[in-house]
């Protein structure tokens, strides 16, 4: 989705400088003039005074620590055929273009190929990609606060965002991957919502600490976790592109332009039998060198696609899309007719818009809730859950291709593994600066195993097979540093539920219990916030719907 009717993807100059997202920075580069873009013409950087261009801000996750993809980059003089071939070979749906000075000058997406190339019958082998690319794409600096960048992408309704560091494009941010991560964690949080709420109450009772604080929104969620249906976010009179099996790919792309859509529903006697998307056209038509004038939809469509019903819960629809790893989901009415086609960005944008305009919820509160949502979704390290980021060894080396690989390190993260009560081993990456963060990661995997009235002691196994207590942030930091010093790449954790626990020398039982109580309380609060925001979007949609 290059644009989807949102703000045009113009370059955004860095606030306070004439800086344009480029492969290499130039001293004389300009960020461009004004214009009627809905977004200001500047890079997506934080407006906060605490911004640092040289490093990451303390306590806030930055774009650099999101799930980034390597950027496939080619010269803008490359032919469309070669560009499409490389995109198909790498199985990516976005390509960055550079000018003769190796400066970033454009972006090309699968939707551009369908609507600007195939629909207009351009000669793939003779037309340079510069003729159809979106010029001067929006970019984001690597040290931009991640929450702000993601919310800007949702508001702008575009998926792909080049990431710039020290004037060079280092990666590409695909919001769909970030949203799928959030969806997976939302799903886990929603399933554990009641257990988390009970755990919060239990910890408050045992430790005499108020975790949630004066939060009316949280109290509302405890009383009623409402999951609205897809019908609440589908606009009236939605136009759906429907085609037949015998229509040609060329004809369908022309209709995509007319409907401003990147997906066509394939129908037989008003029944859905397939779906054809712009990515299908790239991967199955152009890459196979099939003639779009004569190739029929039936030959290249995805048959019998997953679908949803108008009364399906939003969370369930997101779960289907996450499991299937696809972007478009047809929505059917009770008669089986397709009434809409949704995607993750559509759903998230609708939820955010509704949250921001709900009666009784001011913009500051709505923005705060959305920030908590993103913060919760990003609470774990980006390499968790089967990181899809490719390694350098997996890179496809193509001649004359400029390829930017992801080579980020995460100096404040470390690998951990932990066995649950069912004998299953959990492996994950986690920040090491705070014991609360580690406990949060444990709760998100083993929350059902842990009773708030019998909180375990966290221990790790050292090189002598001794179990050593982790009672504070300093303990955690020391354990990780020691593990690194002896060449270990991870720590094995244990949860000790016995009444008589070993303690570190120099730390009293009272001090340790105090530190532990604070860490467990803060961790439960973090996990509860994730459940709250996942369900909270549903509550806000419900409140808005009933206030009209």
UniProtKB/Swiss-Prot annotation:
TM region positions = 521-543
Positions of the UniProt region annotated as Disordered: 1-58
Q: Where is the PB1 domain?
A: 411-498
Looking up PROSITE patterns in the UniProt record yields:
CBS, PB1
Localisation per UniProt entry: Membrane
Pfam families the record matches: CBS (PF00571), PB1 (PF00564)
| PANTHER family attached to this UniProt entry | AMP-ACTIVATED PROTEIN KINASE, GAMMA REGULATORY SUBUNIT, CBS DOMAIN-CONTAINING PROTEIN CBSCBSPB4-RELATED
Q: What is this protein's record name? A: CBS domain-containing protein CBSCBSPB4
Q: Could you tell me which species this protein originates from? A: Arabidopsis thaliana
What does the record give as the organism's lineage? Eukaryota, Viridiplantae, Streptophyta, Embryophyta, Tracheophyta
């Amino acid at each position: 989705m290059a644009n989807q009717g949102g703000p045009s993807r113009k370059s955004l100059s860095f606030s306070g400088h004439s800086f344009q997202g480029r492969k290499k920075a130039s001293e004389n580069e300009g960020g461009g003039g004004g214009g009627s873009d809905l977004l200001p013409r500047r890079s997506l950087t934080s407006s906060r005074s605490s911004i640092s261009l040289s490093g990451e801000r303390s306590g806030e996750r930055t774009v650099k620590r999101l799930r980034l993809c390597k950027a496939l980059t080619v010269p803008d003089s490359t032919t469309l055929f070669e560009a499409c071939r490389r995109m198909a070979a790498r199985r990516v749906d976005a390509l960055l273009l550079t000018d003769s000075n190796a400066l970033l000058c454009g972006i090309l997406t699968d939707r551009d190929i369908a609507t600007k190339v195939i629909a207009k019958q351009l000669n793939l082998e003779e037309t340079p990609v510069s003729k159809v690319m979106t010029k001067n794409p929006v970019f984001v600096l690597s040290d931009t606060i991640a929450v702000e960048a993601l919310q800007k992408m949702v508001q702008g309704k575009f998926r792909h965002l080049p990431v710039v560091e020290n004037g060079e494009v280092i990666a590409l941010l695909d919001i769909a991957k970030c949203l799928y991560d959030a969806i997976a964690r939302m799903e886990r949080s929603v399933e554990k919502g009641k257990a988390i709420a009970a755990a919060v109450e239990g910890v408050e009772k045992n430790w005499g600490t108020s975790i949630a604080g004066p939060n009316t929104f949280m109290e509302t969620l405890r009383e009623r976790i409402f999951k609205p249906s897809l019908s609440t976010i589908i606009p009236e009179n939605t136009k759906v592109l429907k085609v037949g099996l015998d229509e040609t790919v060329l004809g369908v792309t022309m209709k995509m332009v007319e409907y401003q859509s990147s997906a066509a529903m394939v129908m037989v006697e008003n029944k859905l039998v397939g779906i054809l998307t712009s990515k299908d056209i790239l991967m199955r038509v152009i890459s196979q060198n099939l003639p779009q004038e004569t190739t029929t939809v039936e030959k290249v469509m995805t048959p019998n696609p997953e679908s949803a019903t108008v009364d399906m819960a939003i969370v369930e629809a997101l779960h289907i899309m996450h499991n299937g790893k696809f972007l478009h989901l047809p929505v059917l009415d009770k008669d089986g007719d397709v009434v809409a086609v949704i995607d993750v960005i559509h759903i998230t944008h609708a939820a955010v818009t509704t949250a921001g305009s709900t009666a009784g919820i001011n913009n500051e509160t709505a923005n705060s809730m959305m920030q908590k949502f993103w913060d919760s979704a990003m609470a774990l390290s980006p390499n968790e859950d089967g990181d899809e980021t490719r390694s350098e060894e997996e890179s496809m080396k193509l001649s004359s291709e400029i390829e930017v690989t992801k080579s980020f390190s995460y100096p404040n993260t470390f690998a951990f593994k932990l066995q649950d009560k069912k004998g299953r081993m959990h492996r994950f990456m986690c920040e090491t600066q705070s014991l609360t963060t580690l406990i949060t990661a444990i709760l998100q995997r083993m929350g059902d195993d842990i009773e708030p009235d019998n909180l375990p002691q966290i221990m790790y196994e050292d090189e002598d097979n001794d179990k050593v207590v982790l009672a504070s942030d300093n303990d955690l930091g020391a354990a990780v540093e020691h593990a690194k010093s002896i060449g270990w790449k991870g720590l094995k954790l244990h949860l000790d539920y016995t009444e008589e626990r070993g303690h570190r020398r120099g730390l009293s039982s009272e001090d340790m219990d105090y530190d532990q109580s604070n860490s467990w309380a803060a961790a439960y609060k973090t996990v509860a916030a994730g459940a709250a925001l996942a369900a909270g979007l549903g509550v806000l949609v419900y409140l808005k719907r009933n206030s009209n």
